[in-house]
Amino acid sequence: YGIKEFIADTKPVASRKYKLSEANFFSQLGMLNDKLIGVSYRPDYPCYIFDRKGKKQSKGFGSYPDGPIKYTDLEIVDAYRAILATNGKDRVAVCHFFTDLIDLFDGEGNLLKRLYGPEHFYTRFIEFKDGDRIGSNADPKYYRDAFYSPVSVGKDFFVLFNGKFVNKPQYNILA
């Protein structure tokens, strides 16, 4: 939607519609020129690109960081769950929910910079099997929130940081 129509029109009409060929994505999608990018829930690449017809491009986008421990495939997608922001053209910021790490990529998926901090922590995830169920839980000793709500405005990039331990009594995601 155009912003003016979205705000003022009681029945806005979409200017473009995309139907993705695959749907295993964790957070919102971003624009990179005429393509879409989404954070994946897969262990091979943290993101994938889709063309304007919604077809997934053959190669994944970006790379997962090396963590403090060797993760299983299930643990890596949980430990590095993320949300992204783009400048709409050629830059992507992947902001991690459970480690204070932001990965900056160019429009081709090449890592430009890894920003650690302000506290340099990793939440550790541990895979479990319970009958037919397989999952991954955060280790409570390390379970912390990191980055939320990234926004790209012009040449600037903004993101909220929490840093609190999730299992503390007065924990609040908002404060």
Model-derived segments and their meaning:
Residues 135-175:
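Loop/turn-rich, solvent-exposed surfaces of beta-rich toroidal or solenoidal domains
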Residues 6-22, 57-77, 110-142:
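Surface-exposed loop and turn segments in beta-propeller and other repeat-based domains
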Residues 26-32, 76-89, 95, 141-153:
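Structural signature of eukaryotic scaffold interfaces centered on beta-propeller domains
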Residues 2-3, 47-52, 170-175:
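Beta-propeller blade signature
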Residues 1-41:
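Long, acidic/polar, low-complexity amphipathic helices and coiled-coil-like
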Residues 42-46, 99-101, 164-167:
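Short glycine/acidic-enriched loop and turn motifs that connect beta-strands
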Residues 35-37, 90-92, 155-159:
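Entry beta-strands of beta-propeller and related beta-repeat scaffolds
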Residues 30, 36-64, 68, 77-79, ...:
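Solenoidal tandem-repeat scaffolds enriched in leucines and small polar residues
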